[in-house]
UniProtKB/Swiss-Prot annotation:
Entry GO MF terms: ATP binding; pantoate-beta-alanine ligase activity
Binding annotation for (R)-pantoate: 61, 155
Function statement: Catalyzes the condensation of pantoate with beta-alanine in an ATP-dependent reaction via a pantoyl-adenylate intermediate.
Involved pathway(s): Cofactor biosynthesis; (R)-pantothenate biosynthesis; (R)-pantothenate from (R)-pantoate and beta-alanine: step 1/1
Protein name in UniProt: Pantothenate synthetase
Keyword ATP-binding: yes
Organism: Pseudomonas savastanoi pv. phaseolicola (strain 1448A / Race 6) (Pseudomonas syringae pv. phaseolicola (strain 1448A / Race 6))
Keywords annotated in UniProt: ATP-binding, Cytoplasm, Ligase, Nucleotide-binding, Pantothenate biosynthesis
Family stated for the protein in its record: Belongs to the pantothenate synthetase family.
EC number of the protein: 6.3.2.1
Lineage: Bacteria, Pseudomonadati, Pseudomonadota, Gammaproteobacteria, Pseudomonadales
Subunit structure: Homodimer.
Length: 283
């Protein structure tokens, strides 16, 4: 696995692979990798001949009071994980390499409806930052396919819409959420949890799972169901950002008649914000 830091080096390496007839896959990350990221890269290696991973902590997608300055930087460990997972090329640009003209006047990519509400409500500008950096990476690499985790369900929906609407010839693949044995979705931010918070954290997915089970059993009153689960989470020590049942494609509010929904949640334990979801399709 080679590691490059400049767009010029990245494009040259990808061009060599493409000249050899190789199918190119891209997996963007912010580093501090865990086994969920490794699963994305391993899936990319199954689907393509040449796997590009990126590690870039993107300032555009962090709000003013978020953890940009403290987000863990673990490059050496990340390189080892990527190598073991089957990565061929790692791109680790600086902020100056990604935004050579500064960020104040940077062209932004906006996916209006899907970026609003849910995480977009509490993290204004976040999805513009995500869509902008991902579109830049897509232009730099021009992959045949790109793989993203379904844990960030709203992000995946935003990227799918961007690719569709801007006619990008890239296949977007969602990979199922990787979980700890107790059900907690793996996240780079789980390391912020103290021992007591880590013990409480699986209750978030349990509430989502119970919501899905109730819907599958025929529950029609979504409002009452969500109110009950919010109270359950608050009793477990969570501060709720949102717990919603939405249409799985549009992410718009939905009703019990909808057979394809997603249950999405974001909640704080202490200062750590956890997100999770469950896609529920009923026949």
């Amino acid at each position: 696995m080679n590691t490059v830091k400049t767009v010029q080096e990245l494009r040259a390496a990808v061009a060599r692979a493409r000249s050899e007839g190789k199918r190119i896959a891209l997996t963007p990350t912010m580093g501090n990798l865990h086994s969920g990221h490794a699963a994305l890269v391993a899936k990319a290696a199954q689907r393509a001949d040449f796997v590009v991973a990126t590690i870039f902590i993107n300032p555009l997608q962090f709000g003013p009071n978020e953890d940009l300055a403290t987000y863990p930087r673990t490059l050496a460990a990340d390189q080892e994980k990527l190598l073991q997972a089957g990565c061929n090329l790692l791109f680790t640009p600086s902020v100056e390499e990604m935004y050579p003209h500064g960020m104040a006047d940077q062209t932004l990519v906006s996916v209006p409806h899907l970026s609003q509400g849910l995480c977009g409500a509490s993290r204004p500008g976040h999805f513009e930052g995500v869509a902008t950096v991902v579109s830049k990476l897509f232009n730099m690499v021009q992959p045949d396919l790109a793989i993203f985790g379904e844990k960030d369900f709203q992000q995946l929906a935003v990227i799918r819409a961007m690719v569709r609407d801007l006619n990008m010839p890239i296949q977007i693949i969602g990979e199922p959420t990787v979980r700890a044995e107790d059900g907690l979705a793996l996240s780079s931010r789980n390391g912020y949890l103290n021992e007591a918070q880590r013990a409480a954290a699986p209750a978030l997915y349990q509430a989502i799972r119970q919501t899905a089970d109730a819907i599958s059993a025929g529950e029609q009153d979504f409002d009452a169901l969500l109110t009950s689960k919010k109270q359950q989470l608050e009793a477990a020590g969570f501060r709720i950002d949102y717990l919603e049942i939405r249409d799985a494609t549009s992410l718009r509010p939905t009703t019990a008649e909808n057979r394809d929904v997603v249950i999405l949640a974001a909640a704080f334990l202490g200062k750590t914000r956890l997100i999770d979801n469950l896609h529920l399709t009923r026949s």
